[in-house]
Swiss-Prot record:
Residues involved in chlorophyll b 1 binding: 49
Protein name: Chlorophyll a-b binding protein 6A, chloroplastic
Residues noted as binding chlorophyll b 2 in the record, renumbered to the chain: 93, 134
Binding-site positions, chlorophyll a 3: 130, 192
Keyword Protein transport set for record: no
GO molecular function terms listed in the Swiss-Prot or TrEMBL record: chlorophyll binding; metal ion binding
UniProt entry keywords in alphabetical sequence: Chlorophyll, Chloroplast, Chromophore, Magnesium, Membrane, Metal-binding, Phosphoprotein, Photosynthesis, Photosystem I, Photosystem II, Plastid, Thylakoid, Transit peptide, Transmembrane, Transmembrane helix
Annotated localization: Plastid, Chloroplast thylakoid membrane
Chain ranges passing through the membrane: 94-114, 133-153
Amino acid sequence: MASNTLMSCGIPAVCPSFLSSTKSKFAAAMPVYVGATNFMSRFSMSADWMPGQPRPSYLDGSAPGDFGFDSLGLGEVPANLERYKESELIHCRWAMLAVPGIIVPEALGLGNWVKAQEWAAIPGGQATYLGQPVPWGTLPTILAIEFLAIAFVEHQRSMEKDSEKKKYPGGAFDPLGYSKDPAKFEELKVKEIKNGRLALLAIVGFCVQQSAYLGTGPLENLATHLADPWHNNIGDVIIPKGIFPN
């Protein structure tokens, strides 16, 4: 009687087995709603970046930081997708180097990144490092050396056939042996891509700030904003002065 009452309320047939005394009956009678499985399937295929949005079939979540975001369909071609993964990771690493390279000199009072050519070299073009002359050349010479060195390294990397080794070469590039623990390595891959994307956004922010306030660095912009948040903000740039005069 109790089971009939429960079933009339929409409770599945698991309830009678739950009321019985044997665990085997409970396990055997465990039903699964077809509708529930369909719902879970739809949920699992939902893009993580926007709940309810369908996840592209080629973004299966296996790549580090894959949240199903590809609104332009750039990764539909498998070869292109691999190339984009590699390019994103390399640009993320450059951005993570650039952000502290921009912030630290300004924080030390050496100057901002926009005016680096004014404080990173003394008259005559002699390169300096932390204010001290570099004995082996001028800025153009150092830039040429860096260009050739990076070109050589990038050429060597491009010759690698294994797509994973292109992105994670290991060996001398993993002196602390982080890749030896597979589970930890996968976790670090996700952390790297997340921090890299944040650094890419920071670089965009630095460039936008500098274009709006010429010759200023990010820390100077931050200090100006904190001094008067109501007036010194993005609205001060995009909203005409005549609408909201000071």
